[in-house]
Amino acid sequence: LIFSNACIHWIPDHQTLIPSLFSHLSEGGRLAVQIPYKRKSVFYGLLFSLLDKKWKKLKEIRLFNELTPEEYYDILSSLSADFSIWESEYYHTVNSFDDIIGWYEGSGLRPYYDVLSPAEKEEFIADLKKLISENFKIQQNGKIILKMPRLFFTVTKD
């Protein structure tokens, strides 16, 4: 078994990476992968809209190397007839809009923070928080639901 939980999206060239990982499996072995599916993420949609407008200088930073499900299908089907691809969405609850930003500060926001001055970082966070506050609903109990879309696939070596 080779598995990756929210990891391979940091590695480029999945067209080469996945067959390479697959080649290390024994017969009957399985590759199992879960990645954040940013294309369906409200948070990343807001972040990318911010980059399209005010923060264009950050737009060239490539966070993830995620492919489409169809692209993964083509890769996996070239390796084995025994594979599956599916999506899921986890619902996490947070206490505040700051908690949403905090969730991503250790991962998805870090490449942006790394190139900003302290003053720019503060302004960037304020801009992002404004968008978040306009697009995430506060529930009756005061909590906020943070939807986390995920893409999964498994492939077994015949």
Regions found by a protein language model. Name each.
Residues A6:
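Binding-interface segments
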Residues F3:
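A conserved beta-strand element that flanks and buttresses the S-adenosyl-L-methionine
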Residues D13-T16, D99:
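Residue-level recognition of oxygen-bearing side chains
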Residues L63-D158:
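Conserved Class I S-adenosyl-L-methionine
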Residues Q15, F22, S26-N95:
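Conserved catalytic/acceptor-binding region of the Class I
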Residues H9-W10:
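A short His-aromatic
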Residues L21-H24, G102-Y104:
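Short, charged, low-hydrophobicity "junction" segments
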